């Protein structure tokens, strides 16, 4: 069956090359591939009438999305046909292309065309399909804001153009949130979007709280509709075998009911919005987020009333759905053989372990980073343990490239932003001569990209890696002591994990076995707090999560499976 359900005009299929003219070899899809974390497969929808200043229901625009907190500058290009129920957005000059078809029955269809690098080093394209559901339909995705509530506040010269400046300003106590749009053109004539800046949670893209800026160019209301919405020829698309909510990111859902207005609940939600700078674009999204917040807040309050050894707190994730939280976890399962070396058990005989250890105090750990909307936790755990090993060898802390692993390690079973494994990343590093520094390869993009490892200078070479024996905390402590930070995996699916704040985390609902692990983190130490032994974990969900990005995880009962799949590298 053809992958795309919508009709195409004869002779209007798109050529198999990206916007830079690079050609791609086409491979048949893998018979089995992992579940996707598809935040980019479904989009925020905007109503056709963007009053008081309408951009029209059909438009094409390109630009750059800047996320200062994630250190990302991401070029994009978008084609939107609201009335036709279809949109296409491509990132990094066509490296990744997403399509949304909201009119495809019954609940819309989304596609993601992404680059992949084969074992032979060839750049190929893969296509993945996600069907919308009644609960999570696929919507048209807009890259322009809904301007309801904006007012003209002045005029500025920006980017060589005279612009009208529109703002929607909200005061939150001592803080204020300002949403600003620069439009070129007269007040009564055609307007061209130039820049949209917002501080807070982005209702357009659904990522972490931050300051976002979209700079637009080449806005037009005319483009070849059918051609631009045709999937590339000769790239078969495969659906997800077992669709889960994480594959249908909750973006502007249709709600079947309207909650009653409760003054106390409204006040709690407003305080959350004040604290985290939230701004919602329309009444439907506001209600949706308020409900998410209330359900999560009730869970947090109930947990804290039980006086457990760790506390939860509302954070930047409190208005998220379970599906959106699941998208932050990117560990895959694999049937590939693990080539790790056996652990040197003889070293356990007469080892004298310190009572506590924290590699941060010795300068072996880079700052906490934000994986953004990419399921790349495995790459952060991999680079973290390599950075520590390199520090122990040379005395220098060199940030290594997660992006290189995301772009290049497909041939060993990793799937870029849709998940991977640390030991498969080790196999790729060892087989390809090493791993580059972040400075040499280029900045982290939070998106799949085309591999260009041959143009980078390698910063570390790998002789092998060691699998730490599972369920053996003494062996894990020894590995941490002698080899630096260790890559570990945990079950991060309990809701309490998302809202951890402080104390020693112990969650009976956490899985303990290998098959229950779903998130990779970096083990940087261990210790004792009020009689409770803990592991010190570094996460990649930004410093806004946990205790400045870190967690104290109980050693008791191998909670969350931290000792089930630990590895460390051996450098050349």
Predicted features, each with a name:
Residues 3, 24, 33-86, 118-126, ...:
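N-terminal leader/targeting segments and the immediate start of mature chains
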Residues 41-50, 146-149, 158-159, 172-174, ...:
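Non-transmembrane domains of secretory- and envelope-associated proteins
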Residues 43-55, 105-177:
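Flexible, processing/modification-adjacent segments and terminal tails
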Residues 61-66, 87-92, 163-172, 196-202, ...:
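Short beta-strand segments that buttress and anchor functional surface loops
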Residues 75-140, 197-210:
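An acidic-aromatic
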Residues 99-108, 176-197, 548-563:
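A short, surface-exposed beta-strand/turn
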Residues 220-572:
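Catalytic-core signature of thiol
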